[in-house]
């Protein structure tokens, strides 16, 4: 009988709640107003002959490399950051190797590492969800071959200082160290450049968040030029579709659009944090386009809150299943108009839940 590999049979399933997403989508950290008008114009003017030809990635990689200030040989365009994670695991992990992941964090680090046959070593973050470099260093062994750190982290929005990331990378030269900068635009600090001196350091960026192109599935993997040929051997030569490749130059050319969107998101983030503080709801200071807040003590509390917000047309994400996140929800931020709708629904939901809780105690 045909059977999947044991590593695959034991994989945890990742099923994001994609069904029934009617309303204001503040649950997946997407750009809530969409991509740049230049990208839309590019789509309208798309040469249909491009769809009949295999996509040519290299010219766009050179364009992206110039935008990032790195050499083209250091850049690989990927089918979203997910593929970049997969490629690193396929390139560097052998069965029985160890992958170090600071939790809570993005689920696909664990899944791709396990699929490669690695043993995942989960390192709990501190009370404030801050990465502790010493704790990570203490979990690194001679079997460690992959270390994944999202910076800013998802779902917490917290960040690790560059010096800590450098310490980790220099302390584990035998491991591929990924710094996932999917939310870079909302934070502004990067590890790009250090990859030239550290051949085991890799940085990823995405066009799914600030750029509003999640449906086109485009990401960037940057690494030392000596390492990238090995990763290219694992990658499909046609991994990024022609439509995405046609749109990427237009996307990076319109930085005014990105900067204005980011400014509105940061303003909305501040407004949400002020509101949460006023209601004495615990939250973690975020450097991303979302905020993680502890609505209650249990999964039931966060589930009830998510349902009440959904009833008001606002979708947010229940993160109670993540380590240390019991009773927590993650709320994506958008421009001013969306922020106003969010805060109104938030106030109404909090008022209603207080009434229900008060009635249950009486």
Sequence positions of predicted segments:
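Short acidic capping loops at alpha-helix termini that bridge into adjacent secondary structure
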Residues: 71-75, 95-98, 143, 181, ...
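PLP-dependent aminotransferase-like
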Residues: 91-149
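Active-site phosphate-binding strand-loop segment of PLP-dependent enzymes
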Residues: 127-181, 185
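PLP-dependent aminotransferase class I/II
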Residues: 200-284
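Conserved PLP-binding catalytic core of the aspartate aminotransferase-like
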Residues: 266, 278-312, 329
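PLP-dependent enzyme catalytic core of the Aspartate aminotransferase-like
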Residues: 308-312, 317, 321-362
């Amino acid at each position: 009988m045909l059977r999947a590999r044991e590593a695959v049979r034991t994989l945890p399933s990742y099923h994001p709640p994609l069904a029934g997403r009617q309303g204001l989508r503040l649950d997946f950290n997407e750009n809530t107003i969409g991509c740049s008008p230049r990208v839309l114009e590019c789509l309208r003017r798309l040469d249909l002959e491009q769809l009949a030809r295999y996509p040519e990635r290299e010219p766009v990689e050179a364009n992206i490399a110039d935008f990032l200030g790195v050499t083209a040989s250091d850049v690989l365009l990927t089918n979203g950051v997910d593929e970049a994670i997969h490629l690193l695991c396929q390139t560097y992990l052998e069965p029985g190797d160890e992958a170090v992941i600071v939790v809570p964090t993005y689920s696909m680090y664990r899944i791709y590492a396990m699929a490669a046959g690695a043993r995942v070593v989960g390192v709990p973050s501190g009370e404030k969800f801050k990465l502790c470099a010493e704790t990570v260093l203490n979990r690194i062994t001679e079997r460690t071959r992959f270390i994944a750190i999202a910076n800013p982290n998802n779902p917490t929005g917290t960040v690790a200082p560059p010096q800590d990331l450098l310490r980790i990378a220099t302390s584990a030269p035998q491991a591929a160290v990924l710094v996932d900068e999917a939310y870079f635009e909302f934070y502004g600090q990067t590890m790009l450049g250090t990859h030239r001196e550290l051949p085991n350091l890799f940085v990823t960026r995405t066009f799914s968040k600030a750029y509003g192109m999640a449906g086109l599935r485009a990401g960037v993997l940057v690494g030392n030029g000596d390492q990238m040929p090995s990763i290219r051997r694992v990658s499909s030569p046609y991994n990024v579709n022609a439509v995405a490749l046609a749109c990427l130059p237009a996307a990076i050319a319109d930085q005014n659009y990105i900067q204005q969107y980011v400014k509105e998101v940061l303003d909305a983030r501040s407004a949400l944090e002020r509101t949460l503080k006023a209601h004495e709801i615990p939250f973690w200071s975020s450097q991303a386009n979302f905020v993680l807040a502890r609505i209650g003590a249990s999964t039931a509390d966060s589930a009830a809150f998510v349902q009440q917000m959904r009833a008001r047309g606002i979708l947010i994400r229940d993160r109670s299943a993540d380590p240390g996140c019991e009773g927590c929800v993650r709320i994506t931020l958008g421009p001013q108009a969306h922020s106003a709708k969010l805060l109104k629904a938030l106030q109404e939901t909090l008022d209603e839940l207080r009434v229900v809780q008060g009635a249950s105690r009486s």
